[in-house]
């Protein structure tokens, strides 16, 4: 299968044995899709259905927890907010899905500038593309429907299809298994959240790029384990085809 070489690689690296990349796993909100505050509003509306309303200390604590948990499965986030009450957590997650789905219906969603072209470049070079989300499968499908992206990717994986969501490696490993990747090092991951970066690291991907179009700054992405930091996912095809030493492309 055609592939994109890692920085400095021509086919298999004779020194390290690193194979070329044949699969790219990208995050969605903040990585390939602009947020525009929709996720935070949906969380705010969802926890309000459980009596946690703006202007209260409980609301401030809950939203701080939401911000720390970006990239994680929405149900896992709700369980962390309502740890002693699973029915409340599940009800809040369903409310999140309704709220975010309604927001898509009202305003749609927009791709990060250059993201669509990046996906086209990757697939045009023979690399398979999987999008990975912290949304439920239903909400994720609504996002892809709104963007018209089903024909731009090879696979979409949601955490309700896997044993665990990010930061566990299950989403990335599931993509590898479903798309027949023989070696975990054939995979590159691009994520805008700490949870997503950790998932890529734990899955053994050879490139784990942090992306700065989300809400997480450079330093936190690096501490989470990013091997590279990109200003945008639009820089990812160039990173994977670079012939010189690996370098950050932030801000380019």
List where the protein language model places each region:
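Conserved H-loop
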Residues: 53, 150-154, 182
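Conserved SAM-binding loop
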Residues: 32, 111, 129, 189-190, ...
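Non-catalytic pre-domain segments flanking phosphatase-related domains
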Residues: 1-26, 248-252
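Substrate-recognition element of Asp-dependent hydrolases with the DxDx(T/V) motif
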Residues: 43, 115-145, 200
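Acidic, Mg2+-coordinating phosphoryl-transfer loop and its flanking beta/alpha structural elements
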Residues: 188-228
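Conserved Lys-Pro-Asp/Glu-containing loop-to-beta segment of HAD-superfamily phosphomonoesterases
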Residues: 166-195
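N-terminal helical cap/lid subdomain that shapes the substrate entry/recognition surface
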Residues: 5, 17-117, 121
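Short acidic, glycine/proline-enriched helix-loop-strand junctions
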Residues: 164, 170-172, 184-185, 217-252
């Amino acid at each position: 299968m055609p592939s994109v070489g890692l920085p400095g690689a021509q086919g298999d690296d004779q020194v390290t044995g690193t194979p070329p990349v044949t699969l790219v796993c990208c995050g969605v909100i903040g990585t390939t899709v602009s947020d525009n505050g929709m996720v935070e509003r949906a969380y705010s509306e969802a926890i309000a259905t459980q009596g946690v309303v703006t202007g209260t200390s409980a609301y401030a604590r809950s939203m701080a927890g939401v911000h720390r948990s970006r990239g994680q499965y929405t149900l896992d986030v709700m369980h962390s907010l309502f740890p002693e009450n699973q029915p409340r957590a599940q009800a809040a997650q369903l409310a999140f899905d309704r709220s975010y789905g309604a927001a898509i219906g009202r305003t749609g969603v927009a791709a990060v500038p250059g993201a669509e072209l990046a996906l086209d470049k990757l697939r045009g070079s023979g690399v398979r593309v999987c999008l990975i989300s912290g949304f439920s499968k239903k909400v994720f499908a609504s996002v892809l429907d709104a963007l018209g992206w089903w024909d731009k990717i090879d696979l979409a994986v949601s955490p309700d299809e896997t044993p665990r969501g990010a930061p566990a490696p299950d989403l990335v490993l599931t993509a590898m298994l479903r798309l027949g990747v023989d070696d975990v090092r054939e995979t590159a991951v691009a994520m805008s959240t700490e949870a997503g970066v950790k998932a890529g690291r734990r899955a053994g991907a050879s490139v784990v790029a942090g992306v700065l179009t989300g809400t997480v700054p450079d330093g936190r992405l690096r501490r989470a384990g990013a091997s590279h930091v990109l200003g945008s996912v639009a820089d990812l095809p160039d990173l994977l085809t670079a012939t010189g030493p690996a370098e950050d492309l932030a801000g380019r």
